[in-house]
Amino acid sequence: MSPFQSLLWTGSQLRLLDQRSLPQETQYRYYDTAAGVAQAIQDMVVRGAPAIGVAAAFGLVLTSQQSAMTDSADLRAQLAIAAETLKAARPTAVNLAWAVDRMLAAIANPDLEAAAIHATLLAAAQQLYDEDVAVNRQIGLNAQALIPQQANVIHHCNTGALATVDYGTALGIIRIAHEQGKQIHAYLDETRPRLQGANLSAFELQAYGVPHTVIVDGASGFLMRQQQIDCCLVGCDRVTANGDVANKIGTYNLALAAKAHGVPFYVACPISTIDRSLATGAEIEIEERDGREITEIRGQAIAPAGTKTWNPAFDITPAELVTAIITERGILYPPYGQALEQVLINPG
């Protein structure tokens, strides 16, 4: 396991590492209600598509454990309300809704009594937790076929252990390459406006001893022109049926720069991030956040009072800019419509 854990179930509470305070301070916060977990997701105490899905799963466990309902129908109604609250916390990441729906499916049997619902939900949440570690590690192992023995890569946002239960997706690829003895150097986009690259990815890679350099988001194209970059590695929050990718704002710009310079652009994600119910990225709901994330840094104003802002948290990268999608079931190549359908049908 990593030297830090983004989330941990204590037996009665969900402990979250408050990522807003990193790297300056390591603070843990404890939650005992689904509403509290939903607020933590919205406030980005915990972030990253896989991590918020697992956090939401334990949010339902908390609702069940604290419920005074002895009638199973009443308990299910209470859980349904909590589920909608959790899903609404961050609408772009499909893993959040996927994890909540999987939890509800686990208790779909109408014959389950209240006590059995409690036990089933806890087991289902723990299974999600354990699966996430195994899935992320497999993504990292599968990707090594694309990473040369000596590699310079560009990474956007944070997709490591802090964004998941452990290892992570795109950053996990870098971590595993380093563990395997590859000479890998990561250039980390700082990732405005919340600086997940500078604050979180640099924090992780420093802990693992992986050589890295932080760059401003606008420097990636010039960096590709100035020196050899072997690939760009990003995670994602949703992949649509045609292979369009929703990821942290700035991903689209990076993909355009990579295309212009002939640099492979790889997206790493678990199968749970694939949403074939949406035909293209145009159908994805994009979360817009408070403009103060742009006009302030850690509470300090950096723009004139009253400045207008537009602050989408994510953007859409068209499938034609994506060289490959790396999953726990293998590496997918265009045409993505066919590849995504096949990987969902055939687990092997």
Swiss-Prot record:
InterPro entries: IF-2B-related, IF-M1Pi, IF_2B-like_C, Initiation_fac_2B_a/b/d, M1Pi_N, NagB/RpiA_transferase-like. Pfam families: IF-2B. It catalyses: 5-(methylsulfanyl)-alpha-D-ribose 1-phosphate = 5-(methylsulfanyl)-D-ribulose 1-phosphate. One of its GO terms (biological process) is L-methionine salvage from methylthioadenosine. It is an enzyme of class 5 (isomerase). Substrate binds at R47, G48, A49, R90, Q196, N247, K248. One of its GO terms (molecular function) is S-methyl-5-thioribose-1-phosphate isomerase activity. Keywords: Amino-acid biosynthesis, Isomerase, Methionine biosynthesis. The record marks C157 as: Transition state stabilizer. The active site is at D237 (proton donor). Its EC number is 5.3.1.23. Pathway: Amino-acid biosynthesis; L-methionine biosynthesis via salvage pathway; L-methionine from S-methyl-5-thio-alpha-D-ribose 1-phosphate: step 1/6. HAMAP family: Salvage_MtnA. Catalyzes the interconversion of methylthioribose-1-phosphate (MTR-1-P) into methylthioribulose-1-phosphate (MTRu-1-P). Belongs to the eIF-2B alpha/beta/delta subunits family. MtnA subfamily. This is Methylthioribose-1-phosphate isomerase. It comes from Synechococcus elongatus (strain ATCC 33912 / PCC 7942 / FACHB-805).
